[in-house]
Amino acid sequence: MYPTWVEARPFMLGSAGGTAEVWRCGIGAVECAARTAGVLAARRPDFILLAGIAGAHPSVGLAKGDTVMVSREYAADVGTLREGRFIPLPVDGNDVKNNFYDNPTSVPPLFRSVASDTVAVAGTPVRAESAACIENMEGAGFFAVCGALGVPFAELRCISNYIGEERGRWRIAEAVGRLAEDVGRFIDAVREWS
């Protein structure tokens, strides 16, 4: 599953492209959650992968073109603004804030495992503090649906930019090319792992 056909196309045209079904989930957590739920209900896959590009925090040691496995997603921009400050909403009335979702699925350790912030606006300063190394726009919705329905899943992201960097400096073409190669490697490894 890919957010856009731009991200999916290199995989679909590559040598591994015929080895898996490919769906587009759309951009944003809500669109991704809705389309993921639809695919899971209609197709009932044994395993589902979300793959796309992401922005990295400049200080975490990731380079553009690095692919990472997301092990935790934070719904980082769910909260309120008070006096110019972002306040994450508490979960179920307790002190836990900044809803997060962990991936319990065991997968081959091919890539560095990181936490990610899911945000509606790339580079937004309106977010909760977290231990995330990267940001994307879909992951929390994907994690929530797959977790709720008990479907094994994984999320791969290839770094196209640094958070806050102007879009002209992003390396989207290089990132989606690398992502296609790494998705193929990951699919092969999952099949051997199973």
Please state what every model-predicted region is.
Residues 1-7:
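Gly/serine-rich nucleotide phosphate-binding loop at the start of the catalytic core
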